[in-house]
From Swiss-Prot:
Family: Belongs to the DNA mismatch repair MutL/HexB family.
Function recorded in the entry: This protein is involved in the repair of mismatches in DNA. It is required for dam-dependent methyl-directed DNA mismatch repair. May act as a 'molecular matchmaker', a protein that promotes the formation of a stable complex between two or more DNA-binding proteins in an ATP-dependent manner without itself being part of a final effector complex.
InterPro entries: DNA_mismatch_repair_MutL, DNA_mismatch_S5_2-like, HATPase_C_sf, MutL/Mlh/PMS, MutL/Mlh/Pms-like, MutL_C, MutL_C_dimsub, MutL_C_regsub
Alphabetical keyword list: DNA damage, DNA repair
SUPFAM superfamilies: ATPase domain of HSP90 chaperone/DNA topoisomerase II/histidine kinase, DNA mismatch repair protein MutL, Ribosomal protein S5 domain 2-like
Protein species of origin: Thermus thermophilus (strain ATCC 27634 / DSM 579 / HB8)
Family annotation (HAMAP family): DNA_mis_repair
Region annotated Disordered, chain positions: 517-545
Protein name: DNA mismatch repair protein MutL
Keyword DNA repair set for record: yes
Entry's Gene Ontology BP terms: mismatch repair
GO cellular component annotations of the record: mismatch repair complex
SMART domains: DNA_mis_repair, MutL_C
Length: 545
């Protein structure tokens, strides 16, 4: 006999369609916030979001009379018909699924409403009452996936990756993530280039080119990699349509590969992000729970290919290459005379071997990366401190508090703060490059405070050391070449910020002398033989190209 499903089973099925991980819950609530016009979003995870999940925004808010409908199935203010989907969420299932899966608490107030509303829901029980509330919406979820044995650390990692992805498509959103009360991500809405540094890493982000192109009401913006950066999978190539993160359609991927076909080896893909802004008739969204698949019109795919080709022509990259190499003219050699270095190999995962002319170079990869990061920090400090997304409280020991009036050079250059009661200050501003590292901010503030006569440059040298690639870290050819190219652009490439050498040079004439060859003898001309005890075991040598 066919029977209608009971309400509790419908709720479980709805949860299964929408919520598989904490990341899914955060995605749904984040999209609700973006649809509400939020400019600031705060995410809190307790127990990886399994014990408690909070998403708070400064968006439009939900009127008190609409709060009960917000947690009903297929209830939404966003969708009138299937041809007019202009929001990230549209199915009206997310809050209903959360209500069925956990204890749900929603506090919300539109800006024009006097006072807010509070909704408490669990299963079929729903209670609403008026309460004081700031403008915006705060959603709290308790007991999500209770008893399922989830890994809290894995859930946090998933949420962090999700938020980094959304920042690539909403780079003006001020976004904060806290796990167990500790800040894991603080992004001030500083734009796409800063979002790329966060998502791809600083070294790779430097190898991305800005893209902006439009025609006939279609527009594409983003960042795409130079030819020297590529991957064998398209897993670091991200796409959004009107702010919605979506999977790369196969047709568009073919167009991208065709645009890069003279720049990348066969089977390689670029790295980057494309943000498409399209009228509704230019794409079709697949109406599944993930909302990740789109079908794009031929005109859109052609526009993206045209945009890439125009960019490559402008950057003088549109030419056949035997292998991926950067073709943009390098800056003139430094005063030290360092020429353009060609990567050969990595030795013991710590040193890069490179050649230039008749000289073999051995480069300490950690010291080189330190120098690159240090000079980048020097340039970025000159931009001055920027407001933090949220002020950060820093506890101080009595001796540290006494140093506040000393006016250390590094402290004044990097931070703005105000006293916040005994033994605490509230950080208001910091350099933008420190915003993505909230756990490091108090430490850097105290380091600058305790300066003990050390200069700003000494502090920046220490900061450059922390994230620099370490000895023992394997680097591929593209990564090694990118590191060498970035080193060449430095003003002082020969020494790290601490004064240690970055590279050693061994000229061909030194090799000729040490191997007992005649000057200029290549591949056969032998000098007088060494005594037997000085001879090295013979081994085949690679032919010179």
């Amino acid at each position: 006999m066919i029977r209608p499903l009971p309400p509790e089973l419908r709720g479980l099925l709805a949860r299964g369609e929408v919520l598989l991980t904490v990341k899914d819950a955060v995605r749904e609530l984040l999209e609700n916030a973006l649809d509400a016009g939020a400019r600031r979003v705060r995410v809190e995870l307790w127990g990886g979001g399994l014990k408690r999940l909070v998403v708070e925004d400064d968006g439009e808010g939900i009127p008190l009379e609409d709060l009960p409908l917000a947690v009903e199935p297929y209830a939404t203010s966003k969708l009138q018909d299937l041809e007019g989907i202009r929001t990230l969420g549209f199915r009206g299932q997310a809050l209903y699924a959360l209500r069925q899966a956990a204890r749900l608490r929603i506090r919300s107030r539109p800006r024009g409403q006097l006072g807010g509303g509070l909704l408490l829901a669990e299963g079929e029980r729903v209670e609403v009452r008026p309460v004081p509330a700031p403008p915006g919406t705060r959603v709290e979820v308790e007991g999500l996936f209770l008893g399922e044995g989830r890994d809290p650390k894995g859930e946090v990692r998933g949420v962090l990756e999700l938020l980094k992805r959304y920042l690539l498509h909403h780079p003006r959103l001020a976004l904060a993530l806290f796990a167990e009360g500790e800040a894991r991500l603080l992004f001030p809405g500083a734009g796409l280039e800063e979002a790329a540094r966060l998502a791809f890493g600083r070294l790779l982000a430097k190898r991305l080119l800005p893209l902006a192109y439009g025609a006939g009401g279609l527009e594409v913006q983003g960042l795409v990699s130079r030819p020297e950066v590529s991957r064998t999978r398209p897993d670091r190539l991200f796409l959004a349509v009107n702010g919605r993160p979506v999977a790369f359609p196969e047709g568009l991927l073919r167009r991208v590969r065709r645009a890069y076909r003279e720049l990348l080896p066969e089977g390689h893909y670029p790295v980057g992000v494309l943000n498409l802004f399209l009228p509704q008739e230019a794409f079709r969204l697949r109406l599944d729970a993930r909302k990740e698949e789109v079908v794009l019109s031929e005109e859109v795919e052609a526009l993206v290919e045209e945009a890439l080709l125009a960019l490559f022509r402008r950057e003088n990259l549109a030419r056949a290459l035997p292998e991926p190499k950067p073709l943009q003219p390098l800056s003139p050699p430094t005063a030290s005379g360092l020429p353009r270095l060609r990567f050969l190999a990595q030795f013991r995962e710590s040193y890069l071997l490179a050649e230039a002319g008749d000289t073999l170079y051995v480069v300490d990869q950690h010291a080189a990366h330190e120098r690159i990061l240090y000079e980048d920090l020097l340039k970025r400090v000159a931009e001055g401190p920027k407001p933090l997304p949220r002020p950060l409280l820093v506890p101080l020991a009595p001796e540290e508090e006494a140093l506040l009036e000393a006016g250390q050079e590094a402290l004044a250059a990097l931070f703005r703060w105000e006293p916040f009661g005994p033994g605490r200050v509230r950080l208001l501003m910091a350099p933008a490059f420190l915003h993505p590292y909230p756990l490091l901010l108090p430490e850097v503030f105290k380091e600058a405070l305790r300066g003990e006569g050390r200069s700003l440059k000494a502090l920046l040298a220490r900061l450059a050391c922390l994230p620099a690639v370490k000895a023992g870290h394997p680097l591929g050819e593209a990564q090694g070449q990118a590191l060498l190219d970035a080193l060449l652009a430095c003003e002082t490439p020969w020494a790290c910020p601490h004064g240690r050498p970055v590279l050693l040079a061994l000229k061909e004439e030194d090799l000729i002398r040490r191997f007992g060859r005649r000057s200029g003898a290549r591949g056969g001309g032998e000098a007088r033989p060494r005594p037997q005890e000085e001879s090295f075991p013979e081994a085949p040598l690679p032919r010179e190209p």
